[in-house]
Amino acid sequence: MTRALILVAICLMLTLNNAAETKVHIVYLGEKQHDDPDSVTESHHQMLWSILGSKEAAHDSMTPWLLSFRSQTNQFPSESTLRFYELQTTRTWDYLQHTSKHPKNILNQTNMGDQLIIGVVDSVTLNWFGFILLKQEYGQSLNHSVTMVLDQYQNVGKEVQLGHAENPEYISPRDFDGHGTHVAATAAGSFVPDTNYLGLGRGTARGGAPRARIAMYKACWHLVTGATTCSAADLVKAIDEAIHDGVDVLSISNGFSVPLFPEVDTQDGVAVGAFHAVAKGIPVVCAGGNAGPSSQTISNTAPWIITVAATTQDRSFPTFITLGNNVTVVGQALYQGPDIDFTELVYPEDSGASNETFYGVCEDLAKNPAHIIEEKIVLCFTKSTSYSTMIQAASDVVKLDGYGVIVARNPGHQLSPCFGFPCLAVDYELGTDILFYIRSTRSPVAKIQPTRTLVGLPVATKVATFSSRGPNSISPAILKPDIAAPGVNILAATSPNDTFYDKGFAMKSGTSMSAPVVAGIVALLKSVHPHWSPAAIRSAIVTTAWRTDPSGEPIFADGSNRKLADPFDYGGGVVNSEKAANPGLVYDMGVKDYILYLCSVGYTDSSITGLVSKKTVCANPKPSVLDLNLPSITIPNLAKEVTITRTVTNVGPVGSVYKPVIEAPMGVNVTVTPSTLVFNAYTRKLSFKVRVLTNHIVNTGYYFGSLTWTDSVHNVVIPVSVRTQIMQRYYDEN
């Protein structure tokens, strides 16, 4: 078959309304009609000439912003204003039991990913020729490199929309802020012994597939404001190049906040690009976003994407605070300076004995008189969820000649090193204990010890506060996130420009960090099972995930109120690479299933045709979105009894026999027929029906359960989430 070509013209349209405004449009022109590039360009000019009215206007509107997309699609003409995305920012693999200690485990089966190619769309990496030069300058500290097969950059969309503003970014594939380097090293970094960050977290750093190759596509750019942005056009182009280059897996650690765009809209460049990648058999792993813990904040929600939440791991950085009454409080920090011996401890507050005003809120410490802070350890409280609050509080105390700061805040946020200054985090409970001690004595004092590294018990696993949560705001019947992985204080390589750079490494937190963990594992699964579809691989990791942490304890979800985690926090659970390699059954899907999904949720025939490059006419009546063959069941509006169909494919022993185990959501009846699935050499696929009936008589929130198919060896678990809605489309706030 002749490879088709999407021709995407990035056109400059000037809207004359007092001032000229530059806009960017992605125009899909369908299959290429000419092999000669000059003929192709001339056909674009002819089209624009007919629209704009003159040959000169057509030429000016397109030059030089022309991108040729090479993936096999056949789009109807459409256009959309450019959308920008945000980047979603050593112990991990041991915690996940993803090691090479057993001779038959997935790392050894795949030779640690040798010959695999993981495509990373990000800010690229410190490698290739730029890496060689930097290594000469900075020595061996950059050894946590990845094996690069190519790197490219796309910045047409960014340049057109934002212009070539003065900023420190490299207009080349070289990484500026370290985000892409960190992501690539997490997915496929080589073994680097005796790695640490400020002396903490010491061990051997490596990626999930340490011998895999990385193909980097730079579509994200550091701006003069300090932010990093990724244009939709650059993302689509980068994904298209990755498809053309033949990557095995794509890892994309960016997204945007609600409200989300429809999956068929080119403004959702990730969803559109990912669809074409998945159609070519390339799994796409995406960060779920950092807008948690609020519900309905999950991004990258298309059902063909593997969407990843972030958890902590069984490692912490305890820092001991000893009060003058010999009570020791254990905070968290990244402090590796000297001991701070017993020093005056203060909480700035009005006592009524002074005409001065004092401020105990962390954001207002700089407003305090200098003598209140000078040569003291300061306690403050904040409601902020940003790690930058700790940095700012430390900076303010330093300027006022203080000796340290203890920040009381909601738990679950990223730690900051505060550049060698002792800044410690405690929760409100411990902060209140310290405050009561201060108020109980005329001469409160405290001493601070350097941070230690604690690994294993009793450190528990939690879904990170920042990790975006479901349910899915576009299609509530599609469970998102799909899976969770460690994404808090992940130690990996970075750029020297990284604010938190330390000898080539940094600790970063975000779903940006958890997504490449899963991407590395997905690459290995594709090596073990090269004929599995992206949907089968997604099913394998969802149905075999840990729903307790590796020590067997329940997983909690951090937030304003810590609670037991549910599928909207972590999808199927925490990824388990060994079990995913041998799941027993998979819930498989292909492009036809995704087209049925698009029809079921009400997209028009023309918009679906534009996405899938194939004329599509949806059936009437529409199929049910509940029947999409996902490894989950999510019913957002149950009022009457519904029956749902799923199909499983046996990828285990030929003669397997499975029976269901049902854990029904509270107040909901769930039955499965047939009650046994019997596979043989001629029957690899079997369907079953799930009947769901609510006993509730009022609108409820979601209740959770599970459906497990078991053959006594494999336990194939899918989450079940049900919300009763007697009154449909009802916003419940009473």
Curated annotation (Swiss-Prot):
Transmembrane intervals: none
Entry's Gene Ontology molecular function annotations: serine-type endopeptidase activity
SUPFAM superfamilies, per database record: Subtilisin-like
Domain Peptidase S8, residue spans: 92-581
Domain PA positions: 361-438
Statement: the UniProt record of this protein carries the keyword Secreted: yes
Location (main, coarse): secreted
Keyword Hydrolase: yes
PROSITE patterns per record: SUBTILASE, SUBTILASE_SER
Enzyme class: hydrolase
UniProt propeptide residues: 20-88
Pfam families according to UniProt: fn3_6, Peptidase_S8
Signal peptide residues on this chain, from the entry's feature table: 1-19
EC nos: 3.4.21.-
Family: Belongs to the peptidase S8 family.
The protein's name in its UniProt record: Subtilisin-like protease SBT3.2
This protein's encoding gene: SBT3.2
